[in-house]
Amino acid sequence: MLSVGGGRSAVCRAVIATSIVWLLIDVVILFYYLDPSTSQQQPFPEDNRILNRARRIEPLPPAAQHDSDPDAHPIQPEKQEKQVYPVDKETANQLRKLMETQAFGPGYHGQGGTGVTVPEDKKTIKEKRFLENQFNVVASEMISVNRTLPDYRSDACRTSGNNLKTAGMPKTSIIIVFHNEAWTTLLRTLHSVINRSPRHLLEEIILVDDKSDRDYLVKPLDSYIKMFPIPIHLVHLENRSGLIRARLTGSEMAKGKILLFLDAHVEVTDGWLEPLVSRVAEDRKRVVAPIIDVISDDTFEYVTASETTWGGFNWHLNFRWYAVPKRELNRRGSDRSMPIQTPTIAGGLFAIDKQFFYDIGSYDEGMQVWGGENLEISFRVWMCGGSLEIHPCSRVGHVFRKQTPYTFPGGTAKVIHHNAARTAEVWMDEYKAFFYKMVPAARNVEAGDVSERKKLRETLQCKSFKWYLENIYPEAPLPADFRSLGAIVNRFTEKCVDTNGKKDGQAPGIQACHGAGGNQAWSLTGKGEIRSDDLCLSSGHVYQIGSELKLERCSVSKINVKHVFVFDDQAGTLLHKKTGKCVTGADQRVTLDECGLGRKDQMWQLEGYQSP
């Protein structure tokens, strides 16, 4: 006969075992519907304890079933329900709590990429939890991890996709780095990749956990990913390493011939993978990025981005989106499915041949945490024999945050300046002066030893940065040909022309010279523009004697005649070519006035000026 204590113990063990079994059944049922060999329309059983609110689950049909190549067959995964994965009590409870609030089916908010509005009674918790990841976690939890999205591709891209033969293409390892990512955004990333990717093109997904401190990203995630129908590897880094080193960890593990880096809060769309893989397979020195659409950080609405934008950068070495210039549009012609050759990529999402990635030096391991690595690899690829493309037929939505939720050792600015300085020192030659003039604080940041990276550049016989500006990015805010760089100083008052932090359409001013660059950093280009980053001094739309000069966005292709000046170094005058008037510094204003011989308010010195 069992004792009372022993009986209770046996009952407890039975209850725990039953709970774990039910959890495994629940998860198995979920992933049964991710198996392409199963029906896509069957309802979940009525007694499904976790998903009983979603009476009918209709996961997105895997892209493998609609492969454009009739001879290509998806890899059939083993029947997941035949496998048993041990789950301890604590992990089982964590998974149950996570999945009770998790939406799987199509009957939830946000379908078709629409946004969601958080109910009034949840506004307080929404605002509190927004700080967790700097996006609306509550809204994300209201949206199915299998949410539907329209086919956003152009007709030309659909036609191109239907004609694309993917049989025999190399397999891809998808690498996703995360740190304290929200559960639902990470899962939505995984589900969308698996639902919308041909299985025969996927070698594996590699998740690199950069020292997260949230419990659900350890054992619960380990257990969850084992049920997916493709190999998913999860590595937990022992120390916070940053995006760059974490990606290197993932790339070293990768078995695929192509590496495809993704962020942890994205949603891929129909036909996203095939164009990227095909372009890299065609030329192993191509690096190809998708169009990056916007997922609202508040409502999670999916908003498509323009097909005619490309990546650039400014004097701060910040990545920027700009309109594709006419010369590139002309090269592409009327074919909307043709990739855009871009000077830089955003860096979060791109595909690259694995061997080429290592041949050209992978990532600069001297960089810290995150920031600037995208410009460094962009310059390196172009200057060392490769090319960069944005493919309009591949679209991936990305949750863009207004600020990072993460902390940086020594502060964000220090890390960003450190990384940018390494890029400037290794790749930008004499043009690094533009960065240091615009960001004087970077002069005080230690860039570290860059000798190995310079040796790499020499070994690869990479081209000069001037070549890059002249041949790849002639529209860059950094002029390939310039006459001066620095302050514009009145020779008698010793005061400087200053942007005063003004923007397009506003007027600069005159301030005491501080010698630190920044707002007082100007360049007289070989074409006669007076630039401060991507803003040019201009006579403005309406000119009259004594009117103030304006700041205007510099022209991308053809020089605007309103922006052209002629400097006489001997007389010190800056003549506005169109009006024939001289730049005049009166009080705190910068104006155009009648030129007068010996007028002290019209005598200027341009720092670093070199005559043509």
UniProtKB/Swiss-Prot annotation:
Spans within the Lumenal topological domain: 35-612
Membrane topology field: Single-pass type II membrane protein
UniProt keyword list: Disulfide bond, Glycoprotein, Glycosyltransferase, Golgi apparatus, Lectin, Manganese, Membrane, Metal-binding, Signal-anchor, Transferase, Transmembrane, Transmembrane helix
GO terms for MF: carbohydrate binding; metal ion binding; polypeptide N-acetylgalactosaminyltransferase activity
UniProt: substrate binding residues: 210, 240, 370, 401, 406
Disulphide-bonded residues: 157-393, 384-462, 496-513, 536-554, 582-595
Bilayer-spanning residue ranges: 14-34
Biological process annotations from GO: protein O-linked glycosylation; protein O-linked glycosylation via threonine
Pathways per UniProt: Protein modification; protein glycosylation
Region (Disordered): 61-86
Keyword field contains Glycosyltransferase: yes
Domain comment (free text): There are two conserved domains in the glycosyltransferase region: the N-terminal domain (domain A, also called GT1 motif), which is probably involved in manganese coordination and substrate binding and the C-terminal domain (domain B, also called Gal/GalNAc-T motif), which is probably involved in catalytic reaction and UDP-Gal binding. The ricin B-type lectin domain binds to GalNAc and contributes to the glycopeptide specificity.
Gene that this sequence comes from: gly-3
Cofactor(s) in the UniProt record: Mn(2+)
Sugar-bearing residue positions: 146, 239
Binding site for Mn(2+): 263, 265, 398
Entry-linked InterPro entries: GalNAc-T (IPR045885), Glyco_trans_2-like (IPR001173), Nucleotide-diphossugar_trans (IPR029044), Ricin_B-like_lectins (IPR035992), Ricin_B_lectin (IPR000772)
This protein's name: Polypeptide N-acetylgalactosaminyltransferase 3
Annotated Basic and acidic residues bias: 66-86
Localization terms from the record: Golgi apparatus membrane
Domain Ricin B-type lectin: 478-607
Keyword Nucleotide-binding: no
Region feature (Catalytic subdomain A): 169-279
Function: Catalyzes the initial reaction in O-linked oligosaccharide biosynthesis, the transfer of an N-acetyl-D-galactosamine residue to a serine or threonine residue on the protein receptor.
